[in-house]
Amino acid sequence: MINTTPVGMYPDCGVSPLTLSAFPRLAGVFDLIYNPLRTALLLEAETLGIPCANGLYMLVAQAAASSRLFTRASDRISCRTELVSMQEAGSRKIRAIFGKLLAERTNLIFIGMPGAGKTTVGALCAKALGRPFADLDVIFEKEAGMTIPDFFRTYGESAFRDRESEIASRFGKEGGYVIACGGGIVLREENYAYLKQNGVLIHLTRPVELLPTDPSRPLSSSREALREMEKIRAPRYARFADLVIANEGTPSEAAEKAVSAFSGEMQGSAR
Protein backbone atom coordinates (compact mmCIF):
# COMPACT_ATOMS: atom_id res chain seq x y z
CA MET A 1 0.00 0.00 0.00
CA ILE A 2 1.46 3.37 -1.04
CA ASN A 3 -0.13 6.60 0.13
CA THR A 4 0.57 9.51 -2.22
CA THR A 5 -2.18 11.76 -0.83
CA PRO A 6 -1.63 14.56 1.72
CA VAL A 7 -4.14 12.99 4.13
CA GLY A 8 -2.56 12.92 7.59
CA MET A 9 0.10 15.52 6.84
CA TYR A 10 1.02 18.30 9.30
CA PRO A 11 -0.80 20.24 10.65
CA ASP A 12 -3.85 18.03 10.06
CA CYS A 13 -2.34 14.99 11.74
CA GLY A 14 -4.20 11.98 13.07
CA VAL A 15 -6.35 11.15 10.04
CA SER A 16 -5.89 8.34 7.55
CA PRO A 17 -7.05 7.82 3.94
CA LEU A 18 -8.14 4.24 4.71
CA THR A 19 -8.24 1.45 7.29
CA LEU A 20 -5.56 -1.20 6.90
CA SER A 21 -7.54 -3.89 8.68
CA ALA A 22 -9.61 -4.13 5.49
CA PHE A 23 -6.54 -5.60 3.72
CA PRO A 24 -5.66 -8.85 5.52
CA ARG A 25 -2.91 -9.82 3.03
CA LEU A 26 -1.12 -6.48 3.08
CA ALA A 27 2.66 -6.99 2.96
CA GLY A 28 3.87 -3.42 3.44
CA VAL A 29 2.89 0.24 3.78
CA PHE A 30 4.77 3.24 2.40
CA ASP A 31 3.52 6.75 3.17
CA LEU A 32 5.19 9.52 1.18
CA ILE A 33 4.39 11.92 4.03
CA TYR A 34 7.37 12.62 6.33
CA ASN A 35 5.78 15.25 8.59
CA PRO A 36 4.79 13.76 10.97
CA LEU A 37 7.29 10.93 10.91
CA ARG A 38 4.53 8.44 11.70
CA THR A 39 1.14 9.25 10.24
CA ALA A 40 -2.02 7.58 11.52
CA LEU A 41 -1.63 5.18 8.59
CA LEU A 42 1.88 4.17 9.65
CA LEU A 43 0.91 3.88 13.31
CA GLU A 44 -1.87 1.50 12.33
CA ALA A 45 0.61 -0.50 10.25
CA GLU A 46 2.97 -0.75 13.22
CA THR A 47 0.13 -1.89 15.46
CA LEU A 48 -0.78 -4.61 12.95
CA GLY A 49 2.85 -5.68 12.59
CA ILE A 50 3.04 -4.65 8.94
CA PRO A 51 6.44 -3.40 7.66
CA CYS A 52 6.18 0.33 6.93
CA ALA A 53 8.18 3.47 6.15
CA ASN A 54 7.68 7.18 5.64
CA GLY A 55 8.90 9.41 2.83
CA LEU A 56 11.84 11.13 4.55
CA TYR A 57 14.56 8.95 3.02
CA MET A 58 12.99 9.35 -0.41
CA LEU A 59 12.96 13.13 0.08
CA VAL A 60 16.70 13.17 0.77
CA ALA A 61 17.51 10.76 -2.07
CA GLN A 62 15.39 12.83 -4.46
CA ALA A 63 17.26 16.00 -3.43
CA ALA A 64 20.60 14.27 -4.01
CA ALA A 65 19.51 13.13 -7.48
CA SER A 66 18.32 16.64 -8.32
CA SER A 67 21.65 18.07 -7.18
CA ARG A 68 23.54 15.73 -9.50
CA LEU A 69 21.33 16.77 -12.42
CA PHE A 70 21.62 20.48 -11.69
CA THR A 71 25.42 20.33 -11.33
CA ARG A 72 25.78 17.85 -14.23
CA ALA A 73 28.10 15.77 -12.03
CA SER A 74 27.74 12.68 -14.24
CA ASP A 75 29.16 14.60 -17.23
CA ARG A 76 32.54 14.65 -15.49
CA ILE A 77 32.70 10.87 -15.04
CA SER A 78 35.34 9.31 -17.32
CA CYS A 79 35.00 5.62 -16.40
CA ARG A 80 32.71 3.11 -14.68
CA THR A 81 34.94 2.97 -11.57
CA GLU A 82 34.48 6.68 -11.00
CA LEU A 83 30.72 6.31 -11.48
CA VAL A 84 30.50 3.50 -8.89
CA SER A 85 32.66 5.49 -6.48
CA MET A 86 30.45 8.56 -6.89
CA GLN A 87 27.30 6.48 -6.34
CA GLU A 88 28.70 4.89 -3.17
CA ALA A 89 29.75 8.28 -1.80
CA GLY A 90 26.32 9.62 -2.67
CA SER A 91 24.60 6.78 -0.82
CA ARG A 92 26.70 7.42 2.30
CA LYS A 93 25.88 11.11 2.16
CA ILE A 94 22.16 10.39 1.72
CA ARG A 95 22.18 8.11 4.78
CA ALA A 96 24.08 10.70 6.82
CA ILE A 97 21.69 13.53 5.91
CA PHE A 98 18.68 11.28 6.49
CA GLY A 99 19.97 10.33 9.94
CA LYS A 100 20.60 13.98 10.83
CA LEU A 101 17.13 15.08 9.72
CA LEU A 102 15.49 12.15 11.52
CA ALA A 103 17.24 12.96 14.79
CA GLU A 104 16.49 16.68 14.51
CA ARG A 105 12.82 16.00 13.87
CA THR A 106 12.27 13.35 16.56
CA ASN A 107 11.02 14.40 19.99
CA LEU A 108 12.54 12.91 23.14
CA ILE A 109 9.54 12.31 25.41
CA PHE A 110 9.49 11.31 29.08
CA ILE A 111 6.64 9.39 30.68
CA GLY A 112 6.47 7.88 34.15
CA MET A 113 5.07 8.14 37.65
CA PRO A 114 4.54 11.52 39.33
CA GLY A 115 7.78 12.54 41.00
CA ALA A 116 9.95 10.17 38.95
CA GLY A 117 12.06 13.13 37.79
CA LYS A 118 10.68 13.71 34.31
CA THR A 119 10.86 17.51 34.54
CA THR A 120 14.34 17.66 36.07
CA VAL A 121 15.87 14.99 33.85
CA GLY A 122 14.04 16.31 30.79
CA ALA A 123 15.38 19.83 31.31
CA LEU A 124 18.92 18.47 31.62
CA CYS A 125 18.49 16.48 28.40
CA ALA A 126 17.15 19.54 26.59
CA LYS A 127 20.20 21.52 27.66
CA ALA A 128 22.58 18.74 26.61
CA LEU A 129 20.91 18.37 23.20
CA GLY A 130 20.37 22.09 22.61
CA ARG A 131 16.61 21.64 22.25
CA PRO A 132 13.53 23.47 23.54
CA PHE A 133 11.93 21.87 26.60
CA ALA A 134 8.18 21.51 27.08
CA ASP A 135 6.75 20.40 30.43
CA LEU A 136 3.13 19.61 29.63
CA ASP A 137 1.99 20.04 33.25
CA VAL A 138 3.56 23.51 33.43
CA ILE A 139 1.96 24.43 30.12
CA PHE A 140 -1.38 23.14 31.39
CA GLU A 141 -1.24 25.29 34.53
CA LYS A 142 -0.16 28.37 32.58
CA GLU A 143 -3.01 28.03 30.09
CA ALA A 144 -5.62 27.07 32.70
CA GLY A 145 -4.62 29.89 35.03
CA MET A 146 -4.62 27.57 38.04
CA THR A 147 -2.72 24.67 39.52
CA ILE A 148 -3.55 21.11 38.52
CA PRO A 149 -4.87 20.22 42.02
CA ASP A 150 -7.18 23.26 41.88
CA PHE A 151 -8.33 22.27 38.38
CA PHE A 152 -9.08 18.74 39.60
CA ARG A 153 -11.15 20.06 42.48
CA THR A 154 -13.02 22.57 40.32
CA TYR A 155 -13.66 20.64 37.11
CA GLY A 156 -12.85 16.99 37.85
CA GLU A 157 -10.44 14.47 36.36
CA SER A 158 -12.29 13.96 33.06
CA ALA A 159 -12.03 17.65 32.16
CA PHE A 160 -8.36 17.59 33.13
CA ARG A 161 -7.67 14.59 30.88
CA ASP A 162 -9.48 16.26 27.97
CA ARG A 163 -7.30 19.32 28.23
CA GLU A 164 -4.16 17.27 28.82
CA SER A 165 -4.82 15.33 25.60
CA GLU A 166 -5.33 18.54 23.65
CA ILE A 167 -1.93 19.82 24.80
CA ALA A 168 -0.30 16.48 23.98
CA SER A 169 -1.77 16.56 20.47
CA ARG A 170 -0.51 20.10 19.94
CA PHE A 171 3.08 19.48 21.03
CA GLY A 172 3.30 15.90 19.78
CA LYS A 173 2.95 16.95 16.15
CA GLU A 174 5.84 19.39 16.46
CA GLY A 175 9.44 18.21 16.18
CA GLY A 176 12.80 18.64 17.89
CA TYR A 177 11.50 18.97 21.46
CA VAL A 178 12.30 17.34 24.75
CA ILE A 179 8.90 16.81 26.39
CA ALA A 180 7.98 15.86 29.95
CA CYS A 181 4.46 14.46 30.28
CA GLY A 182 2.18 14.27 33.28
CA GLY A 183 2.14 10.91 35.02
CA GLY A 184 -1.35 10.08 33.79
CA ILE A 185 -0.78 10.78 30.10
CA VAL A 186 -0.89 7.01 29.47
CA LEU A 187 -4.45 6.67 30.78
CA ARG A 188 -5.90 7.66 27.40
CA GLU A 189 -4.93 5.51 24.44
CA GLU A 190 -5.34 8.43 22.02
CA ASN A 191 -2.31 10.07 23.62
CA TYR A 192 -0.09 7.26 22.31
CA ALA A 193 -0.62 8.40 18.71
CA TYR A 194 -0.18 12.06 19.65
CA LEU A 195 3.20 11.38 21.26
CA LYS A 196 4.44 8.55 19.07
CA GLN A 197 3.89 10.31 15.72
CA ASN A 198 7.16 12.22 16.15
CA GLY A 199 8.55 10.81 19.37
CA VAL A 200 10.80 8.32 21.10
CA LEU A 201 9.17 7.67 24.46
CA ILE A 202 11.32 6.99 27.52
CA HIS A 203 9.72 5.52 30.63
CA LEU A 204 11.62 7.09 33.52
CA THR A 205 11.35 4.76 36.51
CA ARG A 206 11.98 5.34 40.19
CA PRO A 207 11.16 3.12 43.20
CA VAL A 208 7.81 4.02 44.80
CA GLU A 209 9.61 4.45 48.12
CA LEU A 210 11.53 7.37 46.63
CA LEU A 211 8.55 9.10 45.01
CA PRO A 212 7.26 12.21 46.81
CA THR A 213 3.72 12.26 48.18
CA ASP A 214 1.54 15.35 47.92
CA PRO A 215 -1.61 15.65 50.08
CA SER A 216 -2.94 18.33 47.70
CA ARG A 217 -2.98 15.81 44.83
CA PRO A 218 -5.67 13.16 45.40
CA LEU A 219 -4.04 10.62 43.10
CA SER A 220 -0.65 10.73 44.87
CA SER A 221 -1.61 11.78 48.38
CA SER A 222 0.08 8.85 50.16
CA ARG A 223 2.54 6.01 49.66
CA GLU A 224 -0.37 3.55 49.44
CA ALA A 225 -2.02 5.68 46.75
CA LEU A 226 1.22 5.71 44.76
CA ARG A 227 1.58 1.93 44.99
CA GLU A 228 -1.96 1.46 43.74
CA MET A 229 -1.34 3.97 40.96
CA GLU A 230 1.82 2.19 39.85
CA LYS A 231 0.00 -1.15 39.76
CA ILE A 232 -2.64 0.29 37.42
CA ARG A 233 -0.30 2.31 35.23
CA ALA A 234 2.68 -0.06 34.87
CA PRO A 235 1.25 -1.97 31.87
CA ARG A 236 0.29 1.31 30.23
CA TYR A 237 3.78 2.74 30.63
CA ALA A 238 5.13 -0.48 29.10
CA ARG A 239 2.69 -0.14 26.19
CA PHE A 240 3.74 3.45 25.43
CA ALA A 241 7.50 3.24 26.05
CA ASP A 242 10.25 2.64 23.52
CA LEU A 243 12.98 2.74 26.17
CA VAL A 244 13.22 2.43 29.95
CA ILE A 245 15.67 4.47 32.04
CA ALA A 246 16.03 4.01 35.81
CA ASN A 247 16.39 7.24 37.78
CA GLU A 248 17.94 5.87 40.96
CA GLY A 249 21.08 8.01 41.16
CA THR A 250 21.48 11.70 40.41
CA PRO A 251 19.36 13.50 37.81
CA SER A 252 22.53 14.14 35.79
CA GLU A 253 23.27 10.42 35.64
CA ALA A 254 19.73 9.66 34.46
CA ALA A 255 19.92 12.43 31.86
CA GLU A 256 23.22 11.11 30.55
CA LYS A 257 21.72 7.62 30.18
CA ALA A 258 18.64 9.04 28.47
CA VAL A 259 20.64 11.09 25.94
CA SER A 260 22.83 8.07 25.18
CA ALA A 261 19.81 5.78 24.74
CA PHE A 262 18.06 8.33 22.53
CA SER A 263 21.15 8.76 20.36
CA GLY A 264 21.45 4.99 20.02
CA GLU A 265 17.80 4.72 19.02
CA MET A 266 18.30 7.39 16.36
CA GLN A 267 21.39 5.70 14.95
CA GLY A 268 19.52 2.41 14.75
CA SER A 269 16.55 4.01 13.01
CA ALA A 270 18.80 5.70 10.45
CA ARG A 271 20.43 2.44 9.31
Which role does the model predict for each range below?
Residues 110:
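Hydrophobic anchor at the beta1->P-loop junction of P-loop NTPases
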Residues 132, 138-196:
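ATP-dependent small-molecule kinase phosphotransfer cores
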Residues 9-29, 40, 44, 187-192:
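Rossmann-fold NAD(P) dinucleotide-binding segment
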Residues 113:
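P-loop (Walker A) phosphate-binding loop of NTP-binding proteins
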Residues 27-69:
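Rossmann-fold NAD(P)-binding glycine/threonine-rich loop
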Residues 118:
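Conserved lysine of the Walker
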Residues 197-236, 243:
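A glycine- and Lys/Arg-enriched "phosphate-lid" helix/loop adjacent to the NTP-binding pocket
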Residues 88, 92-104, 124, 128, ...:
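NTP-dependent small-molecule kinase module
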